[in-house]
């Protein structure tokens, strides 16, 4: 079992990191008292191999020796990896003032500034023994995600599932699309009597559209757009991306262009799915 312990100063990004770990398949528990950690791991044994626990100042033992004892006396087969997130006092003060949240150590006799300073001093023993110390003062959530993914997975490559979907506007627009392209302005094979009963999967229709320079130009521009922004979409921690291509009836132009785009991106590192909404038994 792999156990990730998330600790750090309040406001430094522990909750954000825990959500990232959940997206990576970890069973996550927020603010678990350390004395209960062994019991939890035994209960989860056999059910999951990935567990993440966050702790804060309110559920840590006061003595450093007790802290080390809890982190070393783990059940057999548990591999511990620990993170400590920190930010400067100034950044934490700004974050709390912006969110108007209550600091866990704030009360009538302690100001926010004092609570931040007290917590920082109290957590120093833990900060000194963790595997990975990350200062989030200048990081956004995507930078933090990249650092953690690199530590856990060894690289920043994330497999993105791209769904290419053709549809007909007269049957309604798909609601799940991230990008939608309207291709109704392109030459329509529907007006060719021989091509009308066919679809964009048939070679005569493909030849008809491939011979039109504007069709190929438009496809190339969509490819360039997606190739430019896919890295940023991946950094946004996406798992799925849906590209919808629509023509009037969803039979010819949208089907052909969807197939062309899917074939182009199949050569990359992404998983590709194709759906032709208005055609039966044509998905792949």
UniProtKB/Swiss-Prot annotation:
Keywords: ATP-binding, GTP-binding, Nucleotide-binding. One of its GO terms (molecular function) is GTP binding. Transmembrane segments: none annotated. GTP binds at residues 56-59. ATP binds at residues 8-15. PANTHER family: RNASE ADAPTER PROTEIN RAPZ (PTHR30448:SF0). Belongs to the RapZ-like family. Displays ATPase and GTPase activities. This is Nucleotide-binding protein Shal_3708. It comes from Shewanella halifaxensis (strain HAW-EB4).
């Amino acid at each position: 079992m792999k156990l990730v312990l998330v600790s750090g100063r309040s406001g430094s990004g522990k909750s954000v990191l825990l959500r990232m770990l959940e997206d990576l398949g970890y069973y996550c528990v927020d603010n678990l008292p350390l004395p209960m950690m062994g019991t939890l791991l035994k209960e989860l044994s056999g059910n999951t191999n990935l567990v993440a626990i966050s702790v804060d100042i309110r559920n840590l033992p006061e003595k450093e020796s007790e802290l080390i004892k809890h982190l070393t006396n783990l059940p057999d087969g548990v591999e511990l990896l620990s993170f400590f997130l920190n930010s400067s006092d100034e950044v934490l003060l700004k974050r709390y003032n912006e969110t108007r949240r209550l600091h866990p150590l704030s009360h009538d006799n302690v100001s926010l500034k004092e609570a931040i300073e007290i917590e920082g001093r109290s957590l120093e023993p833990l900060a000194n023994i963790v595997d990975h110390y990350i200062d989030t003062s200048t990081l956004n959530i995507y930078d933090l995600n990249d650092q953690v993914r690199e530590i856990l997975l060894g690289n920043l490559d994330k497999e993105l599932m791209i769904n290419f979907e053709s549809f007909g506007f007269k049957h309604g627009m798909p609601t799940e699309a991230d990008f939608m392209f309207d291709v109704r302005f392109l030459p329509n094979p529907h007006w060719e009597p021989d091509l009308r009963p066919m679809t964009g999967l048939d070679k005569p229709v493909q030849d008809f559209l491939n011979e039109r320079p504007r069709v190929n130009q438009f496809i190339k521009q969509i490819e360039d757009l997606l190739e430019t922004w896919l890295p940023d979409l991946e950094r946004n921690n996406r798992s799925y991306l849906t590209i919808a291509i629509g023509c009037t009836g969803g039979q010819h132009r949208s089907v052909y262009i969807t197939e062309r785009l899917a074939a182009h991106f199949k050569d990359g590192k992404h998983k590709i799915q194709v759906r032709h909404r208005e055609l039966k038994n044509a998905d792949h």
